[in-house]
Amino acid sequence: MYRRTLTRTLVATALAATLLAAAGCSGDSDDAKAKGKSLEKVTYLTSFGTFGRDAYAYVAKEKGYFADAGFDVDIKPGGGTGENLKIVTAGQAQFAPIDLTGMLLAAGSGQAKGFVAVSGIQQRTMAAIITLEGNGITSPKDLEGKTLADSPASVVRNLFPTYAKLANIDASKVTWQNGTPQTLMGTLAAGKAAGIGQFVVGKPTVESVAKKTAIVLPYSDYLQDLYGNVLLTSSAYAKEHPDRVKAFTGALLKGLGDSIANPDAAAQMLKKYVPTTNPQAAAAELTLMGPFVKSEASGVPVGALDSQRVARSIAILQGSGQIKPGLTPEQVIDFSLVPKA
């Protein structure tokens, strides 16, 4: 009797364990499938290469913010405003940060269409010319007679005529040569160009490459109303998936906030995905970028865009002759998707 009872007990225990294990495996599998189905695969381009200033996207990925928002994000190095515009409007990427002024130049000249900004990234333009001590450039006027390098698609290069006009530079006396995000700093360090198009936050990275003190000529000294980068998507994607756009934006801005709050940690996360990263230079870039992202004094929330200020930016570009009359903020920005205070 005892043996029969023991046998029944063992069989029941084994069966229960088997059912429990099966149920557990099924649950894990179902959860995995559910998560897999809920994650939309999207491609995100960085603004320009994989420098510290773009670490916030990798932070959002590493911390699971994108996954929590329903996205499986493939982050690829961007090639500047013009290139990013082409790739996003062609449907080869869903999101990318680009300089708002570059977007206005493209839209106002009729070079591109089918895109829309859905969030701000930086509240002031970070466009600049960076040179090195000893190159004979300490003021904008010194750029005359010099050779500068930048990508043809870069907003720094494309906005230069307006900057030159306001800074009293004869743009016809400045020579430009082509470069890529990956080669520009090496070109400057090797003395193959007197200056390069960069963002102001690139100063520490330039110095780490060139082993010399960098001199920065910020465009914002003369163009104070211009925004920096904004988050771009295609008009079609924004129209068809407004809730997804808002979810992605929220996740990205969360990564941006974390990166500004803790640059050192963000730099280490960037290095995990981009092994060639110099963590010290990357963290320094993020530290410099902080005031451009959010001004505590103004109380403007991260991601905000103001239509009146964008209109003033358009007026500046029209006044310098770089874009034709007729462009409005609503043609390039979907304010219904822009984060509110």
For every predicted segment, state its role.
Residues 1-12:
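Bacterial N-terminal signal peptides that target proteins for export
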Residues 20-24:
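C-terminal motif of bacterial Sec signal peptides marking the signal peptidase cleavage site
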Residues 26-29:
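Bacterial signal peptide processing site
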Residues 33-170, 175-178, 185, 194-200, ...:
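Short, glycine-/small- and polar/acidic-enriched structural segments
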Residues 40, 106-118, 206-219, 281-283:
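Ligand-binding "clamshell"
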Residues 101, 182-274:
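Pocket-lining segment of extracytoplasmic ligand-binding domains
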Residues 240-320:
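Secondary-structure end/capping motifs
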Residues 310-341:
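Conserved C-terminal helix/tail region of periplasmic/extracytoplasmic solute-binding proteins
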